């Protein structure tokens, strides 16, 4: 990231087409949940790089009667409240509860690069500077939007993500070997 930071930096707001928090439909209204088919993401679902399954669902009516919105697949799902920084890339369209942002990447942004950027120590440090403490810690999107971030070309973004994928794969193999030897 250090090499990237020597180039021009852009506000985070230029990295996405759409971004926003979700919302939780009123839990006492059973019609918002019973036989729901829309994946409803909570913080515990953000435990892996790729969001490939979840346990909670809401109905179309539940989505309409709350501030939840349908986040398209291949977006970044980022916790900006309470457990700030939990992050995944969704493999299918989802809705989220409040305190979790859906970030739909701009056309010049590789979702894998956006994931790496938002997972970086640089981004975490910048987030820690803007956290508002009230009832719970929150990093508001209006403040996140001002974080300056490196934006390499699409080809460079792909090179970066390919390199990190190779490193992650090698680490995974090494960890598996260590488990086997122990």
Each model region followed by its residue ranges:
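Generic alpha-helical structural signal
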Residues: 13, 72, 112, 158-161, ...
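Non-catalytic DNA-recognition/assembly elements of restriction-modification systems
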Residues: 1-23, 48, 146, 150-158, ...
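DNA target-recognition domains and sequence-specific DNA-contacting regions of bacterial/archaeal
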Residues: 13-149
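Hydrophobic structural patches
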Residues: 1-2, 160-171
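A generic structural signal for alpha-helix starts
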Residues: 7, 108-109, 122, 154-155, ...
């Amino acid at each position: 990231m250090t090499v990237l930071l020597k180039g021009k930096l852009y506000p985070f707001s230029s990295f996405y087409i759409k971004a926003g928090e979700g919302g939780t439909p009123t839990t006492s209204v059973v019609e918002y949940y019973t036989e729901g088919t829309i994946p409803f993401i909570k913080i515990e679902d953000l435990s892996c790089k790729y969001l490939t399954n979840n346990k909670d669902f809401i109905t179309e009516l539940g989505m309409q009667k709350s501030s939840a919105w349908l986040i398209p697949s291949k977006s970044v799902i980022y916790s900006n409240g309470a457990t700030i920084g939990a992050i995944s890339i969704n493999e299918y369209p989802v809705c989220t509860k409040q305190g979790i942002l859906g970030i739909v990447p701009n056309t010049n942004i590789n979702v894998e690069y956006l994931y790496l950027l938002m997972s970086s120590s640089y981004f975490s440090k910048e987030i820690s500077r803007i956290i508002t403490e009230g009832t719970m810690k929150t990093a508001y999107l209006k403040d996140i939007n001002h974080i300056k971030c490196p934006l390499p070309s699409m080809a460079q973004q792909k090179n970066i993500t390919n390199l990190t994928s190779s490193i992650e794969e090698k680490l995974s193999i090494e960890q598996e070997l260590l488990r086997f030897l122990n």
